[in-house]
Swiss-Prot record:
Keywords attached to this entry: Ribonucleoprotein, Ribosomal protein
Protein's UniProt name: Large ribosomal subunit protein uL29
SUPFAM superfamilies xref list: Ribosomal protein L29 (L29p)
The keyword Thylakoid belongs to this UniProt entry's keyword annotation: no
Family to which this protein belongs: Belongs to the universal ribosomal protein uL29 family.
Protein's UniProt keywords contain Ribonucleoprotein: yes
Species per Swiss-Prot/TrEMBL record: Sulfurisphaera tokodaii (strain DSM 16993 / JCM 10545 / NBRC 100140 / 7) (Sulfolobus tokodaii)
Gene3D superfamilies: 1.10.287.310
Gene, per the UniProt record: rpl29
Gene Ontology terms, MF aspect: structural constituent of ribosome
GO cellular component: ribonucleoprotein complex; ribosome
Pfam families, alphabetized: Ribosomal_L29
Length: 88
């Protein structure tokens, strides 16, 4: 069975990484998230001004933002689990 991927990140791969690797991925994803949020704001302004030609791009950006937030949630849970395991 093929494992699930979100934005090129394999979910099973995430659970096999160390805490340091997960923190690095988290920082990378937060940077992408900020970039996408700024781009979304820019596109919304363009849409209001009537200069946006591809209105579907707003929907696509919102979906990408949701995917990144999902990944961040998974990574945060995995970091918590690994920290709990290391304390035992």
């Amino acid at each position: 069975m093929k494992s699930k991927e979100i934005l090129g990140y394999d979910i099973k791969e995430i659970s096999n990484q160390t805490v340091e690797q997960l923190i690095e991925k988290k920082k990378e994803l937060q940077g992408k998230l900020n970039d996408l949020q700024q781009e979304l704001l820019k596109r919304k302004v363009e849409a209001r001004m009537g200069t946006l030609k591809n209105t579907a791009s707003i929907r696509n950006l919102r979906k990408d933002i949701a995917r990144i937030l999902t990944l961040l949630s998974i990574i945060n849970k995995e970091i918590e689990n690994k920290k709990k395991e290391s304390k035992k």
